Swiss-Prot record:
Organism: Methylobacillus flagellatus (strain ATCC 51484 / DSM 6875 / VKM B-1610 / KT)
Protein name, entry field: Large ribosomal subunit protein bL36B
Pfam families assigned to the protein according to its UniProt record, in alphabetical order: Ribosomal_L36
Family membership noted in the UniProt record: Belongs to the bacterial ribosomal protein bL36 family.
UniProt keyword list: Ribonucleoprotein, Ribosomal protein
């Protein structure tokens, strides 16, 4: 999982990528290609 300052590029990397909020942090999850997971500080 990458830790990024901006998730704008992360959510456009794959068409299945979704932005979700968990525990006050913002995550990008990708079911079909999990190597595109990312988190914002």
């Amino acid at each position: 999982m990458k830790i990024l300052s901006s998730l704008k590029s992360a959510k456009t990397r794959h068409r299945d990528c979704k932005v979700v909020r968990r525990h006050g942090k913002i995550f990008v999850i990708c079911k079909s290609n999990p190597r595109f997971k990312a988190r914002q500080r």
